[in-house]
Amino acid sequence: MKDRFAVSMFGQKRLSREGGIEIVVKELCTRMARDGCQVTCYNRSGHHVSGAEYDNKIEYDGIRQKFVLTIERKGLAAVSSSFFAALYSAFGKYDVVHIHAEGPAFFSWLPKILGKRVVVTIHGIDWQREKWKSGFGSKFIRQGEKNAVKYADEIIVLSKGVQDYFKDTYGRETHFIPNGVNRPETREAGLITEKFGLTKDSYILFLGRLVPEKGIRYLVEAFKNVKTDKKLVGSMSIVGVALKQNN
């Protein structure tokens, strides 16, 4: 009897839902496990933001979780955890090693030289982001991008713009597979009204990370120039964030 198709995943911090990459990995892995694949996620060690009960959870919705050595210092957590995840993936019995994001892809050569098929998903051109525009981080991430081009058997991108970038910059073909969404469940907005005093169709919601590349300042400027009685709503004072970005 043939063993189940085995896949290793790394690049995420940990499951379940810490950020965009973690959500993608969770949704992908649970579906693969449901379809009969043996999926192992190599996560960062350390405290889980969702609560202590997740810290050493070995299995999550059919996904095997393993926690790798992580140096808890700024700039080293992602590098160290990605290195050890790549090392375990390289020596493990996996058919495919699936790496998420450009930084972790720096180590794509490691499973590749040991005969593994390597897939890299590019979630964005990370070295262009404001927080990585200078210093070691930017150089490391950009080299990760180049290593993905050189060593990955397949590259997945989430947007046509990134697909064009890889084609124009490296002449590399990629697979355009945008993120999907689960079918939403419609609920009455009673809690929103009760907690925030907001009613249906009375507000414009900003939902996203509060980082410069999201362009919140443009939203605020546009809102200031629109005649409306709607409220502009965010997870914190997005006006304050926008003002900070402009300074």
Could you describe each region identified by the protein language model?
Residues 76-90, 94-127:
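An aromatic- and histidine-rich active-site surface loop
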Residues 87-90, 113, 137-155:
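Membrane-proximal helix-turn-helix segments that form the acceptor-binding/catalytic region
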Residues 1-47, 92, 224-226:
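N-terminal subdomain of nucleotide-sugar transferases
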Residues 117, 127-147, 187:
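Nucleotide-sugar donor phosphate/pyrophosphate-binding loop at the beta->alpha transition
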Residues 8, 156, 197-214, 220-225, ...:
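Conserved donor-binding/catalytic core segment of Leloir-type glycosyltransferases
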Residues 45-47, 181, 207, 231-247:
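Glycosyltransferase donor-sugar binding loop
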Residues 53-55, 186-198:
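A short helix/loop element that forms part of the nucleotide-sugar donor recognition site in Leloir-type
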Residues 161, 180:
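Carbohydrate-associated surface elements
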